[in-house]
Amino acid sequence: MLARLMLLNFFLQASIATVDPYTQLFLRNKGYSYSLVGIIYAVGQVASIIFPIIFCMVSDKTKKTKLLFLLMAIGSLGFVVAALNNSLFLTFVCFFVASACLWTINPMNDGYQNRVLNGDSSKYGVARAIGTLGYVVCLVVFGLSGFPDETSNKSITLAIGLALLLFAVASAFAPQDRVHGTTASEEASEKANEKASEKPTASNTPAANSQPTRKKGFSFSWFNSKFYIIMGIVFISRIAESVVDKMLSSYLTEELNLGSHFSLLVALGAASEFVMLIVGGKLLQKGKVHPYTLITLSALGLTVRLLIYRFFPTTLACVFAAMLHSLNFAALHIGLSKYISQNVNEEHYSLAMSLYWAVATNFPEMIGTLVGGFVIDAYGYPTLFASYAVLPAIAFVLFVVFRKKLRG
């Protein structure tokens, strides 16, 4: 089972490696300004805010996650059309649809894996790390081979299509989703032995599994105050994360003139993420580090990373900055995933992760990319890095202020 999850994660992240670093590039290849690219990104981010919540609720309720993976892969091909067409309107539409599909997969996959692995953060960390390995391998191959050509949209879209095809195949071999801690094939057996096998955990207490709660489409009572506080603070930090996730590729290719080798720097960041996912997952599972600690360190890491870009605009400095991806993304993601598994009932895992991705990641990144495009056009990248570094610094201070509440 774990091996099939690893395969799924490998090709999922390989698909993202063909889309995420190259999206800004194929839009710039079409002659669009930074401001227009920021607006297109913002439209896509709107889709990635709304649709993950909807589709993840469907996944939670139906457990038809493998079918949903396939549908999301097909919809993500909209990036191909967005890159190749000559209509600005069609570019907006296709970018919207493709963003809705691609950025639904991650939160859906997180909730799905939490159910299949019963919240085991060590195994989850391994599975996610293999996904990161797929991301790294893909970008290293790109950087060394020169494929895809970052100046050719046809080359970029060929890579996107191949990667999504491999992910679709891997999803067909993924394990069946679990229904409240069991596989679908075991559900009937569990129901027959329900009274004997029930354990008094938060996820299957009468209150958590009561029928009235299930009938609601959504209820704020499903999540405690700590969940909402931490989402709010992460929101602030993730506005600045948009620089790394959405606007760094053009900086590396146009300002530092790295050409196709820019993907090697992105791969280096992903490699450091790989290490954090493995080590951090094991430390979390053994209780040697609190999820709050990793989440807090992520804000500090992002602050330092942006300041490095601002004051040391060299390739060597960017190498060090890329390694901080282990903190500003990996530490946050694995820490928050564990935090959610500890504070959210199992039946709401996917929804909780979709709220993290949609409301605390994609929405603030929408704001960040929209404003950032205008900042780059008007003032340049140095001002962007300096101004955005303030946000994770504020988040770090807030994490310290709410330490007792969030660790309690």
What label would you give each PLM region?
Residues K66-V80, T293-I308:
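Structural signature of the two symmetry-related core transmembrane helices
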Residues H348-A378:
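A late C-terminal transmembrane helix in Major Facilitator Superfamily
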Residues S155-A172, L384-F402:
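Symmetry-related core transmembrane helices of the 12-TM Major Facilitator Superfamily/SLC fold
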Residues M1-S48, K226-L265, H333:
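Helix-loop boundary and gating motifs at the non-cytosolic
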Residues I50-K63, G146-F147, M276-H290, I376-D377:
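Helix-to-loop junctions at the C-terminal end of transmembrane segments
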Residues F10, L88-N106, F235, A317-A331:
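Hydrophobic core of transmembrane alpha-helices in multi-pass small-molecule transporters
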Residues A174-G232:
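Juxtamembrane intracellular "pre-TM" segments in multi-pass secondary transporters
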Residues F96-I130:
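Cytoplasmic helix-loop-helix junction between adjacent transmembrane helices
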